[in-house]
Amino acid sequence: MSRYRGPRVRIIRRLGTLPGLTNRSAPQLKPSSINQSTSNKKISQYRIRLEEKQKLRFHYGITERQLLNYVRIARKAKGSTGEILLQLLEMRLDNIIFRLGMTPTIPGARQLVNHRHILVNGYIVDIPSYRCKPQDFITIKNKQKSESIISKNIEFYQKSKIANHLTYSSLEKKGLVNQILDRESIGLKINELLVVEYYSRQA
């Protein structure tokens, strides 16, 4: 399944607020009535897991195949599969740029990376899925236009506190990955265990 490029409001209306996809809040909807039949209960449980999976896909802007690969990697690692899955997604370069406040959304961050505006440890990296590590520092190429855009984004989107695993120097225009983030620093309301359950027969 390819990356979604359709209307973003339609997605957040169905799944709720997804800050990585759009900075718009989900519209308030009236709670739907719940059917108490046994068959519908089974369907609803599947739907809940499906929607949690879709939240991850759309928030981080990844394909179904990419998400499945991340789940498989997380399953092979030691520790909580769900937490490791979130760490893998959060340490993607496009997400780090977004969490630093350099762009308003993850698609915006991906565009900067694809256009070769981003350097990691002084080297151009044009792969949005690049996995950042502790002590990596993120800078932008010395181009007046990109610096101007990012400076405006920083000023506006860093009103909320940056997560503890990251720091940003406005003077040097440099972001730093301090450490692997903990569960409390995830920038999305998500039940990752339901995502792991969804993929239990595939990963």
UniProtKB/Swiss-Prot annotation:
Q: Using the UniProt record, give the first listed, main subcellular location.
A: plastid
Q: Name one GO cellular component term.
A: chloroplast
List locations, semicolon-separated. Plastid, Chloroplast
Q: Report the GO molecular function annotations.
A: rRNA binding; structural constituent of ribosome
**Keyword list, A-Z:** Chloroplast, Plastid, Ribonucleoprotein, Ribosomal protein, RNA-binding, rRNA-binding
- Where's the S4 RNA-binding domain? 91-159
Tell me, which GO biological process terms does this entry list?
ribosomal small subunit biogenesis; translation
Question: SUPFAM superfamilies in the record, alphabetically?
Answer: Alpha-L RNA-binding motif
- Taxonomic superkingdom: Eukaryota
Record InterPro entries: Ribosomal_uS4, Ribosomal_uS4_bac-type, Ribosomal_uS4_CS, Ribosomal_uS4_N, S4_RNA-bd, S4_RNA-bd_sf
Pfam families named among the record's database cross-references: Ribosomal_S4, S4
Is Cytoplasm one of the keywords? no
Q: Which family does it belong to?
A: Belongs to the universal ribosomal protein uS4 family.
User: What's this protein's function?
Assistant: One of the primary rRNA binding proteins, it binds directly to 16S rRNA where it nucleates assembly of the body of the 30S subunit.
Self-association state and partner proteins as the record states: Part of the 30S ribosomal subunit. Contacts protein S5. The interaction surface between S4 and S5 is involved in control of translational fidelity.
Q: Identify this protein by name.
A: Small ribosomal subunit protein uS4c
